[in-house]
């Protein structure tokens, strides 16, 4: 497998309320295709209104509108970014915050093209200026009594929104990252990060941004001095006051890993142990139990609050009865509470935030471990190895051309990473995370709309753990994985996970993750002559379902699994019928799959299965393998010539050229086999 980049989770969707409800309703009904009287035109026009409250509500309406994909072209045509940008420096703090919120949503929902357009329209100039102003404001800001009562710092909230915009555009635009480097944004965001003891939300946003901008950015690494590293170290080692601090530590661990090239060699072992120690800590937490506990706590809190409201309502009711006859007493006026950007978000109760923070931290931890194991990415299509067993080399001799040399370089871990992985018990904790999500927690979340997104998060953690397991099994010595018995137990565990889900074939992410893990595990077991616990029938069930997947990765994995299994069975007696079944399956895939990547892997699997062994030779003759491959050979050459240059990368074409050459040699080998058996 190649490197698995950390992916951000989707932003909370804005839901304008109270005085902004009319603007929000107008935005919700818009399609983005309307003429000048549509919601986009009206909202953008109100951005220039002399009233700060009107400008604020217009920004809130735009924050809602940009979530509707059809509206994005209309907003771009009307130059929404150039109109929103100046409002980041508006005289009203509330307008600044809602404008930043609208740009945050726009950058999150619009993707690469929109973010590039935002940078082209110079959003970075007011954004960087706002970040600098907020930094000064945080140091000198005096909150009003009401703000203190609400435990809410408006300048900090603006900074948080601005950092999220910065993160989004830097994740999607190389030009934004370049500006980040040149404008000294690193120093600004590190000053924000220093405030983690009192401003955890802001610190987490900064940590996300730092993890993004430090990836593959050697220019920025030059700006990291001892002071900057100490800021990261203090965040990494901070005491845990909540699950959000766990998330912060995990993100900072990922950032420090991105800085590995500037860490002195004498300190690397210590730093790697600190990183993996933090990741081990988060993976050691039971997410299922945490979700259950947090939901119970929320239920109890809401119950207590409802009881308190009932008592207060009854008391107020008694007072109103006494005042009924007092005609001069006006009706009680409903106070209009000031609308903050947090009001524009869906309700995020503290228990839900805690649960989501832990789940996100665990997902991030697993992704960082995968990156640590796969710092070099030789191929995007999981088929850097041209052969999955030594037997195929018996007849192919030195069959690999020079261009495949870098593809065949074995993955390896430094001694420091290898030791830290085992010392921090990472393999054991990753194994635990491969289990299916806690059924009680899933049931609880499924019954509550605001908690339901946690189910997808729990499933994502399982998939990340399976991908992480694949890396660990491929790279660690089997002794550090628990030896042969542990690998056999793991194979049974993966089999149970797979076949306990009758509809597993419908979930491509899960199927790709578990087939990748199985592929690596079976390869390791085969190379060490460890008996496999999954039956050929079980594997054929997986392969028959997986080969119909729309994911090329899944299809590559299942044919590779059959190649590994078949090459093992070819050494045993009484396997003729199974080998024939495997051969027919692989032959059909090789000749009918629309992807040359899958075709190449299927041919390679055939080379492995039928490279050697009496049963394999008999099976190849009985399924007429030689005739089928001779017929397919010119078709394969033509497909490479016709489709290759336009659809596949140079590395993939290099591998396909090797498969083409190996096919010629394999046909020659099969001719000698058939002649010997039929003469």
From Swiss-Prot:
Ranges occupied by HEAT repeats: 38-69, 74-110
Feature: compositional bias, Basic residues: 1-11
InterPro entries linked: ARM-like, ARM-type_fold, Nuclear_Import_Ribosome_Adapt
CDD domains the record matches: Syo1_like (cd13394)
Residue list for modification Phosphothreonine: 339
A Pfam family matched in the record: HEAT_EZ
Alphabetical UniProt keywords: Erythrocyte maturation, Phosphoprotein, Repeat, Ribosome biogenesis
Sequence segments annotated as region (Disordered): 1-40
GO biological process, one term: erythrocyte maturation
Repeat listed as a keyword: yes
Biological role: Plays a role in ribosome biogenesis and in nuclear import of the 60S ribosomal protein L5/large ribosomal subunit protein uL18 (RPL5). Required for proper erythrocyte maturation.
Family label: Belongs to the nuclear import and ribosome assembly adapter family.
Description of how the protein assembles with itself and partners: Component of a hexameric 5S RNP precursor complex, composed of 5S RNA, RRS1, RPF2/BXDC1, RPL5, RPL11 and HEATR3; this complex acts as a precursor for ribosome assembly.
Name of the molecule in the record: HEAT repeat-containing protein 3
Organism name: Mus musculus
């Amino acid at each position: 497998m190649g490197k698995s980049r950390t992916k951000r989770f989707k932003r909370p969707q804005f839901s304008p309320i109270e005085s902004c409800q009319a603007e929000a309703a107008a935005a919700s009904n818009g399609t983005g295709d309307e003429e000048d009287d549509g919601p986009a035109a009206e909202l953008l026009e109100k951005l220039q209104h002399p009233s700060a409250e009107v400008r604020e509500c217009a920004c809130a309406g735009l924050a809602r509108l940009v979530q509707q994909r059809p509206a994005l072209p209309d907003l771009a045509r009307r130059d929404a970014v150039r109109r929103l940008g100046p409002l980041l420096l508006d005289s009203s703090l509330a307008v600044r915050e809602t404008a930043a919120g609208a740009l945050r949503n726009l950058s999150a929902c619009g993707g690469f093209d929109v973010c590039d357009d935002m940078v082209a329209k110079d959003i970075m100039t007011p954004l960087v200026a706002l970040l600098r102003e907020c930094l000064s404001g945080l140091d000198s800001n005096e909150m009003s009594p009401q703000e203190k009562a609400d435990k809410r710092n408006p300048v900090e909230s603006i900074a948080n929104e601005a950092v999220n915009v910065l993160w989004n555009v830097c994740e999607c635009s190389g030009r934004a990252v370049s500006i980040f480097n040149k404008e000294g944004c690193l120093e600004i965001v590190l000053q924000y990060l220093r405030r983690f003891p009192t401003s955890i939300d802001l610190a987490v946003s900064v940590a996300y941004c730092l993890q993004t901008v430090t990836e593959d950015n050697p220019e920025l690494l030059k700006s990291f001095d001892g002071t900057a590293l100490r800021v990261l170290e203090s965040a990494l080692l901070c005491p845990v006051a909540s699950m959000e601090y766990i998330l912060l530590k995990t993100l900072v661990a990922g950032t420090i890993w991105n800085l590995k090239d500037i860490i002195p060699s004498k300190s690397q072992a210590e730093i790697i142990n600190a990183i993996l120690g933090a990741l081990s800590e988060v993976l050691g937490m039971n997410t299922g139990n945490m979700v259950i506990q947090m939901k119970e706590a929320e239920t109890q809190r809401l119950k207590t609050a409802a009881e308190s409201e009932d008592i207060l309502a009854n008391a107020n009711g008694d007072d109103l009865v006494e005042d009924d006859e007092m005609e001069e007493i006006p009706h009680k006026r409903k106070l209009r509470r000031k609308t903050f950007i947090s009001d524009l978000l869906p309700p995020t109760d503290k228990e839900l935030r805690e649960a989501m923070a832990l789940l996100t931290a665990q997902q991030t931890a697993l992704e960082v471990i995968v990156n640590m194991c796969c710092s070099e990415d030789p191929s995007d299509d999981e088929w850097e190895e041209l052969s999955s067993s030594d037997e195929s080399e018996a007849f192919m001799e030195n069959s690999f051309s020079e261009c495949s040399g870098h593809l065949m370089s074995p993955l390896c871990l430094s001694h420091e990473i290898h030791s830290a992985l085992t010392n921090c018990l990472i393999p054991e904790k990753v194994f635990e995370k491969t289990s299916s999500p806690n059924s009680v927690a899933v049931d609880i979340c499924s019954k509550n709309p605001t908690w339901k997104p946690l189910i997808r998060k729990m499933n994502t953690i399982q998939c990340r753990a399976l991908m992480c397991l694949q890396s660990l099994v491929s790279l660690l010595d089997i002794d550090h994985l628990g030896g042969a018995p542990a690998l056999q137990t793991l194979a049974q565990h993966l089999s149970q996970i797979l076949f306990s889900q009758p509809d597993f074939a419908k979930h491509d992410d899960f199927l790709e993750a578990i087939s990748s893990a199985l592929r690596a595990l079976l390869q390791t077991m085969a190379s060490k002559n460890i008996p496999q616990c999954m039956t050929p029938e079980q594997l054929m069930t997986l392969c028959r379902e997986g080969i119909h997947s729309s994911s090329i990765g899944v299809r590559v994995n299942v044919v590779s699994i059959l190649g590994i299994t078949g090459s093992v069975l070819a050494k045993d007696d009484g396997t003729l019928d199974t080998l024939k079944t495997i051969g027919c399956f692989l032959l059909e895939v090789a000749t009918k799959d629309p992807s040359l990547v899958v075709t190449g892997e299927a041919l390679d699997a055939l080379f492995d299965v039928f490279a050697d062994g009496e049963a394999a030779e008999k099976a190849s003759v009985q399924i007429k393998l030689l005739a089928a491959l001779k017929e397919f050979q010119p078709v394969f050459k033509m497909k490479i010539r016709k489709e290759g240059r336009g659809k596949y990368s140079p590395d993939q074409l290099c591998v396909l050229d090797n498969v083409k050459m190996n096919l010629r040699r394999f046909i020659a080998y099969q001719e000698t086999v058939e002649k010997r058996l039929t003469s």
